[in-house]
């Protein structure tokens, strides 16, 4: 059986990933593609408990290395229990954030550096990398204003200062420059419908290639 495709969505707080995830699901359904929708951190019962630890308040503050290791602990469980089984069944997997977020948030944002994240990535994932990453690129100020406008209590990350998110944004930009074939930038500072149109165009381009057999895993 042919392994399923692995698609990830990335972006800062307020980038619109939840809405984008719905559009991706709807597009794949129209193509008759069986897709599993999931998220990180989380995606499994244990992963969701780790998510609560990561997003909840921590006093004294959680150490950056602890944060990174918890992210990869949740990811390891997610891969073992949900992502790999689905891919091996031939299902496609669409994940709200994956390891690019660890590079951006812990590698750049927390200052741990890409080398440490890469070591955890190789150990946890082996050779598995997403086939396509849709990066919803939103200016920091715009994203944080949108997140604040949801009217929900901010989580531990959303309470960070703007400088943290500027570093995270720099991380995503560096990754997009390094992996231009995999990471497709979508300007998420546009009006919503324009964002979703651009997102679907980037997705459709990749899906068309895959379904035509012109691009192997």
From Swiss-Prot:
Keyword Repeat: no
InterPro entries (UniProt xref): P-loop_NTPase, Thymidylate_kin-like_dom, Thymidylate_kinase
GO function terms (MF aspect): ATP binding; dTMP kinase activity
Residues passing through the membrane, by range: none
CC terms in the record's Gene Ontology section: cytosol
Segments forming a coiled coil: none
Pfam families: Thymidylate_kin
Summary of the function given for this chain in its UniProt record: Phosphorylation of dTMP to form dTDP in both de novo and salvage pathways of dTTP synthesis.
Family recorded in the similarity comment: Belongs to the thymidylate kinase family.
Protein's name in the database: Thymidylate kinase
Species, as recorded: Alkalilimnicola ehrlichii (strain ATCC BAA-1101 / DSM 17681 / MLHE-1)
Lineage of origin: Bacteria, Pseudomonadati, Pseudomonadota, Gammaproteobacteria, Chromatiales
């Amino acid at each position: 059986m042919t392994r399923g495709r692995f698609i990830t969505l990335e972006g800062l707080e307020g980038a619109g990933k939840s809405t984008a995830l719905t559009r991706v699901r709807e597009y794949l359904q129209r193509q008759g593609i069986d897709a599993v929708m999931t998220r990180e951190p989380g995606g499994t019962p244990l992963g969701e408990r780790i998510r609560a630890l990561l997003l909840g308040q921590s006093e004294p503050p959680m150490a950056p290395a602890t944060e990174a290791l918890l992210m990869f602990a949740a990811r390891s469980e997610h891969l073992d229990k949900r992502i790999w089984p689905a891919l091996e069944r031939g299902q496609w997997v669409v994940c709200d954030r994956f390891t690019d977020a660890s590079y951006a948030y812990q590698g750049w944002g927390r200052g741990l550096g890409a080398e440490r994240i890469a070591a955890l990535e190789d150990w946890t994932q082996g050779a598995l990398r997403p086939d396509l990453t849709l990066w919803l690129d939103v200016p920091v100020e715009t994203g944080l204003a949108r997140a604040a406008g949801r009217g929900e209590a901010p989580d531990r990350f959303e309470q960070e200062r703007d400088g943290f998110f500027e570093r995270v944004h720099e991380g995503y930009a560096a990754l997009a420059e390094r992996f231009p074939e995999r990471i497709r930038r979508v300007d998420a500072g546009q009006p919503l419908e324009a964002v979703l149109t651009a997102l679907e165009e980037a997705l459709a381009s990749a899906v068309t290639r895959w379904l035509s057999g012109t691009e192997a895993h």
